[in-house]
Design a protein with these regions (language model features):
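Positively charged, low-complexity intrinsically disordered leader regions
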Residues: 2-76, 80
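Phosphate/diphosphate ligand-binding glycine-rich loop within oxidoreductases
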Residues: 56-132
Length: 132
């Protein structure tokens, strides 16, 4: 059995039914099945990519990155994931947005969500919380 098939088989055994069409903000709000499902999908995508099979699920689209804390690995990981799925990345510069004038990140994310397929937010306000 291929790595791809193993990943799909694993995914089929997990209860991830509540994830479709939902936001993914806080890992600690997700069940173990849902978190394992994320890893199973990542493994399936990796298996396809290693065989040079396109993983693009979008012909075009926009991925917005809003990283409130400096990050190299997270920023490039997000950009790589967007590219893998067929999305263009646009960085949101808070100094050039209404956030600089008091608009909350939530308000900004809500507004840009109408134009974006995915929004990646990094904000270290809950250091060490993660999924427990």
């Amino acid at each position: 059995m291929t790595d791809f098939n193993k990943s799909i088989e694993t995914l089929q055994k997990l209860d991830v039914s509540k994830m479709y069409g939902e936001d993914f903000f806080l890992t600690w709000e997700k069940s173990d099945d849902e978190l394992q499902g994320v890893w199973a999908v990542a493994d399936a995508l990796r298996a396809l990519r290693e065989r040079n099979i396109s993983t693009k699920v979008f012909d075009s689209g926009l991925g917005i990155s809003l990283f409130r804390d400096n990050s190299t690995r997270t920023r490039f990981s997000f950009a790589s994931a967007c590219n893998l799925l067929g999305l263009e990345v646009q960085d949101l510069d808070e100094t050039k947005s209404q956030i600089a004038h008091g608009e909350t990140v939530r308000e900004t994310a809500n507004m840009i969500s109408f134009m974006a397929d995915v929004i990646g937010i990094r904000d270290d306000m809950y250091i060490g919380k993660g999924n427990k």
